[in-house]
């Protein structure tokens, strides 16, 4: 594999959309000192613009309650502590409006270890009061200029029964009430949804289309659309149990093309596209997350999808993430760029390298990304090998790694330079492996089978 570059090559400006948004699990986790320490490191070393998380209206945040007469009461202490910190580290929210406070929740249906209420409100007027009071409080505390740059996302994954217990039409009503409440404070605020996901990406797209059609029919504002393009699906095994499977190598490229096409040909062609969750899988106990594989996976997909969407938020920056409860070990297959102790995983360095690359494109392909920054040529190389069929099967075969010879030739480079090698920068060794069916870690040195990830319940 040979690459030839000329330092004098022309470069094309692009928007580094992959640095727009980083994600985390649950608002209340953001009050913890170790969570804040990890996020401060991420911002110092990488630097994202937005952050997105679940559960700002969970009862642990104590925002909403009612007096003895059933009138809404609002409490902002924990909210202010969290958002003051986010402002300190230069992050703006993609503000996911979830979940339902127990005081106005219909028959409780909770999900996750921290029990988010995935139900519609008993009283849509009280929900509107909560949303409007939150927006007004944000304007009063942080100023209209700051809040105008925020994004307001209505709910999370309402097309999945575990996240929304009622019908599609009921979610559309929630969006209608919510967007009107927000726009009543200032019509310039950016509001969107539906934050759809799914075991089958076609279901995700169908929900998105129906949502856009509803907004158009009701003449509702739609400033951005959001979705979650995980590269997985959930087929049934021979016993009828769901098992996580992996789509094709280029599924994310195809999915983002489809979303882009839907918006371009919709009544909202100028709507932004924010993909507010993304990872190699939607399982918080997928041991692949702790291996080398996510790094070349990210480098390939993030560089190949430049120019298609406005953000693609990595889920999540830390393994301090408790949807399934606290992680059982230091490396438990958590989503994070860092583990619970703050150890940077290979996925972390994928983002770190991209952050160092600048935003003037010289060249890209499956294993290479070249840019110019400050009149300097930056070249990033990796070896991207997708999942093998053996990932899903028992195998007695030894594991094989495929070495790739890369020849790099640079013309018109007259200054002294140092090509940093693997020995000099160990963390730059992000080469993929042909068969990703071994796990790195003391507990998993010689596994014969990967533990199968399970869908969230």
What is each of the regions a protein language model found here?
Residues 1-110, 114-151, 169-195, 220, ...:
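Non-catalytic accessory regions flanking glycosidase/transglycosidase catalytic cores in CAZymes
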Residues 25-37, 59, 70-77, 102, ...:
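Acidic-and-aromatic substrate-binding clefts and catalytic sites of carbohydrate-active enzymes
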Residues 66, 70, 114-122, 162-166, ...:
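Short coil/turn segments at secondary-structure junctions
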Residues 138-142, 162, 215, 260-263:
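Structural motif corresponding to the C-terminal cap of alpha-helices
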Residues 168-312, 330:
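Noncatalytic carbohydrate-binding groove/subsite architecture in carbohydrate-active enzymes
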Residues 318-320, 326-327:
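Secreted, luminal/periplasmic, and some membrane-associated catalytic domains
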